């Protein structure tokens, strides 16, 4: 399955994505905001992701439609949780806003969801702006424990209903 936006194609991962995936996720400025992605990100991790991890429903490689360059990842679960990361080289260009817009359309129209939600970290302002631009509202804050840091932080939750 492929999904399209004005500038992007959301598609399945391929073996050709491996080198770029490793490069994008070995950037500390990207990895520090991802909770489920290991750092450093190795070839072993990329092989597993391409062969198995990305094969679950509704996980997409985010690519630029003009050159097929991998720039990030987006997913939406059958229960409506949405997640996205974009490589630092591609920040501040509106790609995340464009991706989330397409995924909310997919969630409501194709998956027939009545609510889509996302969570981020209080100190990570960019995804909060992306969600707000897409009509999401901050509905609650939950504490979460940061592994390896040894303290609790606030995790804002955002929701959008159909």
Residue positions per predicted region:
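Short loop/turn motifs at secondary-structure junctions and domain boundaries
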Residues: 51-56
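Acyl-donor (CoA/ACP) binding surface of acyl/acetyltransferases
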Residues: 1-28, 32, 59-162
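Conserved GNAT-fold acetyl-CoA-binding loop/helix
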Residues: 29-50
């Amino acid at each position: 399955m492929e999904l399209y936006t004005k500038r992007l194609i959301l598609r399945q991962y391929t073996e050709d994505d491996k080198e770029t995936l490793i490069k994008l996720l070995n950037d500390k400025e990207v990895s520090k905001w991802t909770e489920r992605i290991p750092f450093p990100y190795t070839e072993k991790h990329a092989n597993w992701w391409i062969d198995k991890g990305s094969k679950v429903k509704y996980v997409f490689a985010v690519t630029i439609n003009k050159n097929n360059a991998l720039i990030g990842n987006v997913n939406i679960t059958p229960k409506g949780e949405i997640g996205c990361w974009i490589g630092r080289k591609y920040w501040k260009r509106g790609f995340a806003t464009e991706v989330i817009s397409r995924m909310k359309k997919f969630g409501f129209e194709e998956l027939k969801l009545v609510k889509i939600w996302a969570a981020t970290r209080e100190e990570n302002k960019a995804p909060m702006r992306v969600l707000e631009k897409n009509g999401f509202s901050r509905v609650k804050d939950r504490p979460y424990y940061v592994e390896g840091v040894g303290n609790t932080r606030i995790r804002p939750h955002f929701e959008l209903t159909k």
